[in-house]
Amino acid sequence: MHFTAIVPLVLSMGAFVLSFLALFAGHKEGFMEDYDVVRLNMSRLGYNLLNTSSDGSSDSDSWLDRITDVARDGFSDLINDVGNDVADRLADELGISEWYSLHLMDVCQGDFAPNVTAPNAWLNVTECTQPRPGPNVNLTEMLDQELSIGPLRVSLADLSWPDDIEGTLDKVNKFLLAIFILYVIGIGFSGLSILGSLAAFFLGFRKLVTITNFVFTVLASIALLAGSLITTIGAKEGAKQINDIGDDIGISAEAGQKFMIISWVAFAVIAAAAVYWIAQFCVGRRSRSRAPRRTYTEKRHKQGSF
């Protein structure tokens, strides 16, 4: 047994577990919910327009007038009831969740507990979509449906929902699918690296075993590196675009920092395993080159020819 093979074995297992957790984060209610890729905050949806409408009540085409046409006196009651706590109750009065989180396999939604303005508020998950590769959920359709059955029975059109947000969310859905595929590849090669490390543990650092393990770890590293880069760039850029577009109606988005951390750590761990195997290959090659070569006479003598 070659106990030094435990090093790449542990590294490969670490990358496998971290990648697996990142892939399945949020796939059911309450499971690693805070490891989302992007989270949308809807707790202030319509809040800015509410202020604008209150200040410009003389405008017959104001947002408040349109809401009143749809919900009659419902929104007026909301203004009186909510008062200074509008940030805590507006989403509830509209009939939507306060946040929506995008994971690699689904979309979850819920409320901030105990409320959105509380320090260190935690995420109370109320529902998640069915897990599938790259959730590809139409958030506009989901919100419109929730608003239509809410207390005020309004629509996104009444809230001046910008069409550009859906275009941005479509891009986010595409890079979520790309990340999903890359993580599946990374998990697969990390698993093969585990098996290869076990082979090295029992069989020794043979040339074929070393090269095979190096190939497995390099391919896993490439997949996880690409996934981490797409996550970091795509999530941050997607959140930035949503913030720019949705600021006027109170929508904000945030890239998942915890997901990025676990993603980069998984890459770093499997990359360390790849470095180990290339170092092991170099050491083995140097040892073979320094080994004394027997002469033809010595070989014949060992075979009993003399």
Feature names for model-found ranges:
Residues L177, V184-I230, A279-G284, R288:
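Juxtamembrane interface at the cytosolic side of transmembrane helices
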Residues H27-K28, I233, A274-R293:
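Transmembrane-helix exit/juxtamembrane "anchor" motif
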Residues A121-F189:
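Membrane-proximal, non-transmembrane alpha-helical segments
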Residues I242-K258:
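Short, membrane-exposed interhelical loops at transmembrane-helix boundaries
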Residues A22-E29, A226-G246:
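Helix-to-loop junction signature of class
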